[in-house]
């Protein structure tokens, strides 16, 4: 065996080890399930010392982060609603998603990005609503400024997104910064991409002042867009996520396929291909798709052919209540009747045997 081959084997060893024992458990995700701040700081498993320190110093911020977990997990489930893996959460698991994120996959990349974005959004919103002692509206947005429409005065309450990003970086990244392996670097990259996504949709809103609606004076402020905007953007980044490998000195990434562009700070990155999520696999954290509702007429990921992995589907007829015969009444209401509707619901069949293998 020549020296170059030996070097290749030596180089691959730490990368393999880093994937076997990844730093995946973002235990702060579990904060939605705990109560008071002191109990939260002392009982969330897996928090590193820096996170516990911030937790004790800023209990009101921790409450905002905990409440925000429900918002970003709901957004994750919305984005994956038509896919085999649907961002299912496990209430009794301290990392919230079970073993599914042990793999350094596209799904892991998205979850780390959307969770980091959710922390920025929750903290920034709490600042603007006066719920936090440590921050308020953006103090830099004062005085007079100009844009394409002319001069305006900063007024109202501009969202203090810089504070939200700063705190989120200190808290969310703390555990990853203690690690030096490939997975920690992947998580840090995707965390940053999530934070940047929220700031990307910061928008200027203005109000006109003057006689008869004229705009002789404008007052403007900066406001975050609805979190769905961030979710939709990160979903596009998920679909265009770039597979990477560690560079030779272990300090960064290079693309796994040289035909693809180098990832930017806005892109999501991953190391490993995703499982197919067709069957229940405890080791992989997959719940499988047996019993999932599928769309018989769709040609997308929610189609019965794709969702059910070629296993077929069962059809049942169900009765549900819907709104019907809606009429507009002056002014200003729409009134509807409740009607019963009979519909066919298609659900994926279970595998025929434990050793069944998906054809897709």
UniProtKB/Swiss-Prot annotation:
Cross-referenced Pfam families: wnt
GO CC term (a single one): extracellular space
Maturation and modification: Palmitoleoylation is required for efficient binding to frizzled receptors. Depalmitoleoylation leads to Wnt signaling pathway inhibition.
Glycosylation sites: 295
Highest rank taxon of the organism: Eukaryota
Disulfide-bonded cysteines: 76-87, 127-135, 137-157, 206-220, 208-215, 278-309, 294-304, 308-348, 324-339, 326-336, 331-332
Subcellular location: Secreted, Extracellular space, Extracellular matrix; Secreted
InterPro entries: Wnt, Wnt2, Wnt_C, Wnt_CS
Signal peptide residue numbers: 1-26
PANTHER family according to UniProt: PROTEIN WNT-2, WNT RELATED
Protein name (Swiss-Prot/TrEMBL): Protein Wnt-2
Species this chain originates from: Monodelphis domestica
Gene expressing this chain: WNT2
């Amino acid at each position: 065996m020549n020296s170059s081959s030996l070097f290749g084997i030596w180089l691959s060893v730490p990368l393999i080890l880093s994937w076997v024992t990844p730093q995946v458990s973002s235990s702060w995700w579990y904060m939605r399930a705990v109560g008071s701040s002191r109990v939260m700081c002392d009982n969330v498993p897996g928090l590193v010392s820096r996170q516990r320190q911030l937790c004790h110093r800023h209990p009101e911020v921790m409450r905002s982060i905990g409440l925000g977990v429900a918002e970003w997990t709901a957004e994750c489930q919305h984005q994956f609603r038509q896919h085999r893996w649907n961002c299912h959460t496990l209430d009794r698991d301290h990392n919230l998603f079970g073993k599914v994120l042990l793999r350094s996959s596209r799904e892991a990349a998205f979850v780390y990005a959307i969770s980091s974005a959710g922390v920025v959004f929750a903290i920034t919103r709490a600042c603007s609503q006066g719920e936090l002692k440590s921050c308020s509206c953006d103090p830099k947005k004062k005085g007079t400024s100009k844009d394409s429409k002319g001069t305006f005065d900063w007024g109202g309450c501009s969202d203090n997104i810089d504070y939200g990003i700063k705190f989120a970086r200190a808290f969310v990244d703390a555990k990853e910064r203690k690690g030096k392996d490939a997975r920690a670097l992947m998580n840090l990259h995707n965390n940053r991409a999530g934070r940047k996504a929220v700031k990307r949709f910061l928008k200027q809103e203005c109000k006109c002042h003057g006689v008869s609606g004229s705009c002789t004076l404008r007052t403007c402020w900066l406001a975050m867009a609805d979190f769905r905007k961030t979710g939709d953007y990160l979903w596009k980044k998920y679909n265009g996520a770039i597979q990477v490998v560690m560079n030779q000195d272990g300090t960064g990434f290079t693309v796994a396929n040289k035909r693809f562009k180098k990832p930017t700070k806005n892109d999501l990155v991953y190391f490993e291909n995703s499982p197919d999520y067709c069957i229940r696999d405890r080791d992989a954290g997959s719940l499988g798709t047996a019993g999932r509702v599928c769309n018989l007429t769709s040609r997308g990921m929610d189609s019965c052919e794709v969702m059910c992995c070629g296993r077929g589907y069962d059809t049942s007829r169900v009765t549900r209540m819907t709104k019907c015969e809606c009429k507009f009444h002056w002014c200003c209401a729409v009134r509807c009747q409740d009607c019963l509707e009979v519909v066919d619901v298609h659900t994926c069949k279970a595998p025929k045997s434990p050793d069944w293998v998906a054809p897709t």
